[in-house]
């Protein structure tokens, strides 16, 4: 065992509490803090045994005058001492906040417990605090020592040392010293007992006497060692007690001594080879003196144990008494605590009893309610069985009624067919009897059954669907060997059967070349049957996504004229018909690019509300008045006319055209794909469109005036000097194509609409029918009837056109 330091440490063991610490700070942290709390008036010295691999090779016998070369000692110190200093600084930092005087005693050795025992004996340590076991072994029942080191120190340490053994910061065991009764004055507060003054004086005298004897023998040994500074270490050294050295008194290791032989690795081979007989004799003298010193120290220890033996027994008795009193107080405290807990548990028990009583009462109430619910459940089950029987009975009746309904429908369809055939026969007989040739004032509309509609649309095959919107879905169909378009109206806001048939009858009488012909209806399914137009809509021509050839500017002006003519015809009808939802998708084009307006009069069959405010085709005044008027159709026509001129997105078209007109640069917005627009005509048409889109409906022009103006735009261009007004009476011009009779190719004087939807001169179509023709002069298809309807709107338009010239 060797001390880390070169000089011997002088300690005041009466005022110092020694605390044995481990290499791991966390393991000894609670022990150090416990000592700091309980011995605040004492000085604390940290006792640390540094276990190193070379400790076994160090000798436990002090070599006089430098047994190692100074170079070897410094080499060992440089390797081990920094580690020890770093560890001690960690412990001192832990105690720095307690304001307790601290010191450290560090030694190097192989066996930690033996080194601690030797330190106690060498320094006469009176008060020692050390661990009883690792923290993981702690329990509140723990009263015995678990650590082998603690057990060894408890058994082998001198009886003069009072030792406290702790675990996890709790005092586990106390080993009293045999001289506690003689050291009551210097005892720390934790173990101090009453003692008389004689005992304290005796303790001080004995302690000072032992210290003087120890210093005397050490001085003799050092004097002899100074004379033999050249002495070498022998191969075998006699065992002796290890010297103790202060950790901070020197910058080098102290001379290592101990019961184990010195390792040959630490002995300079050159020094051993130069040894001689004289040096061995002097070394023998020194060894004999050391042996005498050790024997004297042993005698001193024996005398100490004899002197303090009786005092130790008395102190043990006093300690036992004190411990018994402490246990009694602890038991008294436990009894009081147990009594309070018992009282609290009794209160909790009473509370639980009340709660159990309440739960039992609630349970009884629930049981009564359960019995009532079960009784009601039985009644409900019986009622449910009765309802199930009624449901079964009604189901059978319903099935029977459905079969009857199916048979009635079949009979109705048969009767309807018979009725239609009978009506045709009656009409034919009347014409034969009265000599009529188709001058009937009206036409009969055909009603179709739902079964016929279902069969015509292939049971509403999704692949046959042409489109779907807010106001119904449109399917393609084959009805009586003709291609038709079936529009299924929505069910909400539907009229009653009679009113629906009446209004459809009115729409069926409306015939115009630029209107899609309404061929029939199915009141049962609220569906309308129109003629099928296969060439798409005007919206397809405006869209850049479809590969549709662009319309020429001549075709666009003609289409605008046809739209205006059809609207004027609807507005002139009796009763007046408002389209209400005019937009490019509602304007169809046939194979000859002839305009066919669809969905006219839908607002009379279903309520049109909730129109989208973002739709530019909707009249802004509608959102104020919530009413569709003739001016609403004029506004929509103005927007469509602007689209025909520019083919621009409808969202900002009105603003763009106004800006171009203000800057006198209408050619910047005209659609170049239509060809070379006549700039003057384009500007005039744009002005007409802007007038149609006036915010105030009262400022919008009449459609008859607009139609006359657009028709004039279809004529060859005239010089600007001659176009100061709507017409120049002296300039010859060609009449619009729809003013000409398809048969005579002359301007019609009395236009009549035939069953094929075309308008003819009255004389021409009557002569055609009188010659026995039952097919259309235009399509060569068989006409449904020979009824003719006057086209008043077209007649008025022709008269206005003729009046201009």
Swiss-Prot record:
Catalyses which reaction(s): S-ubiquitinyl-[E2 ubiquitin-conjugating enzyme]-L-cysteine + [acceptor protein]-L-lysine = [E2 ubiquitin-conjugating enzyme]-L-cysteine + N(6)-ubiquitinyl-[acceptor protein]-L-lysine
**Annotated segments matching region Disordered:** 181-205, 226-284
Q: What class of enzyme is it?
A: transferase
Domain of life according to the entry: Eukaryota
> What pathway is this protein said to act in by its record?
Protein modification; protein ubiquitination
Which parts form a coiled-coil structure per UniProt?
A: 331-434
Q: Where is the composition biased (Low complexity)?
A: 245-257
Which segments constitute the U-box domain? 734-805
Q: What is the recorded function of this protein according to its Swiss-Prot or TrEMBL entry?
A: Functions as an E3 ubiquitin ligase.
Instruction: Give the protein's recorded name.
Output: U-box domain-containing protein 32
Could you tell me the gene encoding this protein? PUB32
């Amino acid at each position: 065992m060797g001390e880390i330091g070169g000089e011997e440490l002088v300690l005041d063991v009466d005022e110092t509490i020694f605390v044995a610490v481990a290499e791991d700070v966390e393991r000894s942290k609670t022990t150090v803090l416990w000592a700091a709390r309980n011995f605040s008036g004492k000085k604390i010295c940290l006792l640390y045994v540094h276990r190193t691999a070379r400790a076994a090779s160090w000798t436990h016998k002090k070599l006089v005058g430098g047994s190692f070369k100074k170079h070897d000692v410094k080499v060992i110190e440089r390797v081990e001492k920094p580690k020890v200093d770093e560890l001690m600084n960690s412990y001192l930092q832990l105690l720095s906040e307690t304001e307790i005087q601290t010191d450290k005693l560090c030694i190097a050795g192989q066996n930690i417990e033996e080194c601690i025992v030797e330190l106690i004996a060498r320094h006469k340590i009176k008060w020692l605090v050390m661990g009883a076991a690792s923290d993981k072994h702690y329990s509140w029942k723990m009263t015995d020592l678990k650590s082998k080191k603690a057990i060894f120190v408890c058994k082998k340490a001198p009886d003069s040392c009072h030792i406290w053994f702790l675990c996890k910061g709790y005092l586990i065991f106390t080993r009293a010293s045999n001289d506690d009764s003689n050291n009551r004055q210097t005892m720390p507060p934790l173990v101090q007992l009453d003692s008389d003054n004689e005992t304290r004086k005796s303790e001080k005298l004995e302690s000072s006497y032992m210290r003087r004897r120890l210093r005397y023998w050490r001085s003799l040994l050092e004097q002899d060692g100074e004379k033999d500074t050249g002495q070498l270490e022998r191969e075998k050294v006699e065992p002796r007690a290890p010297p103790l050295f202060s950790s901070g008194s020197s910058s080098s290791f102290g001379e290592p001594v101990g019961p184990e032989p010195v390792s040959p690795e630490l002995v300079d081979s050159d020094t051993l080879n130069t040894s001689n007989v004289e040096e061995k004799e002097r070394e023998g003298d020194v060894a004999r003196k050391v042996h005498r010193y050790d024997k004297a120290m042993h005698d001193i220890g024996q005398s100490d144990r004899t002197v303090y033996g009786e005092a130790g027994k008395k102190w043990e008795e006093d300690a036992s008494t004190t411990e018994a009193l402490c246990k009694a107080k602890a038991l008294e405290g436990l009894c009081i605590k147990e009594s309070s807990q018992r009282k609290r548990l009794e209160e909790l028990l009473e509370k639980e009893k009340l709660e159990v009583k309440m739960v039992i009462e609630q349970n009884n109430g629930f049981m009564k309610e359960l019995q009532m619910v079960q009784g009601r459940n039985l009644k409900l089950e019986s009622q449910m069985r009765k309802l199930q029987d009624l449901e079964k009975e009604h189901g059978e009746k319903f099935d029977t009624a459905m079969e009857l309904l199916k048979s009635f429908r079949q009979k109705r369809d048969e009767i309807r067919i018979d009725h239609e055939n009978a009506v045709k026969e009656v009409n034919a007989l009347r014409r034969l009897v009265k000599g009529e040739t188709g001058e009937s004032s009206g036409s009969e509309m055909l009603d179709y059954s739902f079964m016929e509609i279902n069969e015509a649309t292939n049971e509403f095959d999704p692949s046959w669907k042409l489109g779907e919107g807010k106001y119904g879905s449109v399917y393609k169909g084959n009805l009586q060997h003709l291609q038709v378009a079936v529009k299924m109206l929505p069910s909400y806001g539907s009229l009653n059967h009679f009113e629906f048939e009446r209004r459809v009858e009115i729409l069926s009488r409306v015939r115009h070349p630029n209107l899609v012909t309404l061929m029939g209806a199915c009141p049962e399914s609220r569906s309308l049957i129109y003629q099928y137009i296969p060439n798409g809509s005007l919206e397809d021509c405006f869209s850049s996504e479809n590969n549709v050839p662009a319309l020429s500017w001549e075709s666009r002006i003609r289409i605008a004229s046809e739209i205006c003519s059809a609207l004027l015809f609807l507005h002139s009808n009796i009763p007046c018909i408002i389209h209400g939802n005019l937009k490019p998708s509602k304007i169809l084009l046939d194979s000859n690019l002839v305009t066919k307006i669809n969905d006219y009069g839908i607002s009379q069959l279903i309520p049109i509300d909730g129109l989208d405010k973002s739709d530019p085709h909707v009249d802004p005044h509608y959102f104020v008045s919530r009413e569709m008027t003739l001016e609403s159709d004029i506004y929509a026509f103005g927007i469509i006319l602007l689209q025909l001129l520019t083919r621009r997105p409808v969202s900002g078209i009105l603003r763009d055209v106004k800006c171009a007109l203000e800057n006198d640069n209408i050619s910047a917005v005209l659609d170049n794909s239509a060809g070379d627009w006549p700039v003057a005509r384009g500007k005039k048409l744009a002005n007409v469109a802007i007038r149609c889109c006036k915010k105030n409906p009262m400022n919008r022009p009449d459609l008859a005036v607009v139609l006359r103006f657009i028709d004039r735009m279809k004529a060859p261009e005239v010089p600007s000097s001659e176009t100061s007004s709507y017409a120049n009476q002296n300039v010859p011009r060609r009449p619009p194509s729809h003013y000409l009779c398809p048969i005579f190719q002359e301007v019609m004087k009395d236009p009549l609409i035939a069953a094929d939807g075309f308008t003819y001169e009255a004389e021409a179509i009557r002569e055609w029918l009188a010659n026995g023709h039952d097919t259309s002069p235009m399509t060569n298809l068989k006409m449904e009837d020979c009824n003719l309807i006057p086209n008043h709107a077209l007649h008025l338009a022709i008269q206005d056109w003729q009046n201009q010239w």
